[in-house]
Amino acid sequence: MSLNGFYLLPHPPIVVPEVGRGEEKKIENTTKSFEAIAKDIAGKAPNTIIIVTPHGTMFQDYIALAYEDEISGSFKDFRAPNVSMELKINKELTSKIYELAYGERIPSVMATNDILKKYNTSVFLDHGCMVPLYFINKYYKEYKIVHITYAALSDIELYRFGMNVTKAVEELNENAVFIASGDLSHRLREDGPYGYNPAGEKFDKELLNNLKDGNVEGVFSIDKDTVYNAGECGRRSVAVLLGTLEGKKFKGEILSYEGTFGVGYGVMKLEAFSNDTSKLKELERIRKDEYESKKQEKDPYVKLARESLTQYLTTGEAIEEIPDYVTEEMRDLKRGVFVSLKKFGDLRGCIGTIFPVTDNIAEEIIRNAIEAGLNDPRFYEVGKDELVDIDFSVDVLDEPESATREELDPKKYGVIVTHGRKKGLLLPNLEGVNTVEEQLEIALEKADIDSHEDYTIEKFMVTRHKES
């Protein structure tokens, strides 16, 4: 047998009546859709439900497969500790998925309590799983679970992992269904928990329509800025889901979509109806084209940063002769420079200088690009094979000037706090830093300065260069 059910489900705890306490009535269509999906799954009577979630114990660089005899959880973090569940894990299928993924060098880990206790946690059922299962359990309980927490891997790696889920199910002749747990944009309303961004509605519409049409390439071609600004948590679950459908034509049915609370809740059922050509090679082509486009970047600042780290990772030597495309300004001016690396929207390294330590901006970029990739103490060293998925940005700092708290603006100015020899800097216009208080708190923490100590404040502006 093979997978015989494919679903995209949200996970708002508020839809559970014991949590919502009446508020769940505001997303009544989501409730009805959960009920319909639960009945559909009960009709299939699977012996295993495979679910991928954003909210289990997550490793940045390894997909985590829960591997204990049982897994349990409750809604205690959502005011409903009496609503709990305990499920048996299908260890044979979990082990087979891991074995196949490991054989293809897809970063994965069998997450046991012994391993997780090193990180002060354990195997547990998170709300990303429990919300869908709450409704399923009303109609059907004769199943084991495979619990997967995705990681910040490339679309290709997540897709290939999904392919191995299907392969494992087929090799073991399991009767199983697959659930991709994920909310869509978290930025649909000003009064929502994460505010409003027009990219939210755009992302949700594009993702759902592409899934409805069975357009795999369309899903993976959604503009990265749109994905990032939407603030979603479901796209990586969808990448695994699409991998389980590799080689199949499919269509999707949107049972409901609501954004009442500022977060997109999309409920979908996908149905494979015939064989299709492989989409994997096309996705690999898209990824290669994106990388080639990055290497042809026209902005000389980020172009130099990428070439600097690339050459060092390739040859072990830094760029010595400044390339011809470098501008006169970059050759003649001395400025502090920060080089930032992001992988799939998450920070992967950032090192910079408040004041210049080299002869010009170009040399500062060459130096700090290597430092950001290899010597940011928050991260392990960047590998050469990661460069295809990393986006570079370069901030050139203006001269800092003394400032008062009232003169700060986290969107316009960066900030430097100083107490004795302790100094902390935070760049301007950073995601998640919206107030002066937040900006100062982070800068003080970076400098290990207590907020009650006397410290000086400086502000500065930057010219930010990003890959197009």
Swiss-Prot record:
Q: Where is this region: Unknown?
A: 1-289
Record's signal peptide? none
Stretches assigned to the AMMECR1 domain: 296-468
Q: Which domain of life is it from?
A: Bacteria
Which terms in the Gene Ontology molecular function aspect does this entry carry? Answer: ferrous iron binding; oxidoreductase activity, acting on single donors with incorporation of molecular oxygen, incorporation of two atoms of oxygen
Pfam families, from UniProt? Answer: AMMECR1, LigB
| HAMAP family linked to this entry | AMMECR1
> What is the protein's name according to its record?
Protein CA_C1420
